[in-house]
């Protein structure tokens, strides 16, 4: 059995591999990877990042986004979101963006992975999953990056605050808010808290 065939037998469908992951099974990893990409076994996603595709009735399926980002970062702690998620808040954002944002601790910048562009943002703190409270704080953090009128969005944010869980919102603001977001939202939240207490 050839070394390439031996390497091929160790691969699992649907998995994303770094070049370094394949070193344990190959004595000539670069040559073997080139051969596997050439014969269609592996797909090159980015420099040093490869995918062994699952096959469906429609052909090869793309890698799962979480597996792709996890392999790229070599880390499990990240949050993938999109400016499109702001539209779910009902605060007047309606634009659709072809952009994915990855909050993480390791990388910063734009990277093309598997044909999609991801904006990696190195942040000290971010939640494990997206919540409406985090989204609202994140929207105010990134207000300068949305296409809609900022005053209009902020007016709608102040209205939306009234329907949200104040404790969760204050915690999200404290943990994830920029100084600008804190200066804009803290007075509104304090006013709501006083009104809620009365």
What are these regions, as identified by a protein language model?
Residues 1-73:
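Short beta-edge/loop segments at beta->alpha junctions of small alpha/beta modules
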Residues 1-4, 30, 62, 66, ...:
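Alpha-helix initiation and N-capping motif
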Residues 28-29, 92, 179, 195:
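Short coil/loop linkers at secondary-structure junctions
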Residues 44-54, 68-114:
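Short gly/ser-rich loop at a beta-strand->alpha-helix junction or flexible surface loop bordering the NTP-binding
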Residues 114-122:
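A short, charged helix-loop
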Residues 123-198:
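Hydrophobic alpha-helical interaction segments
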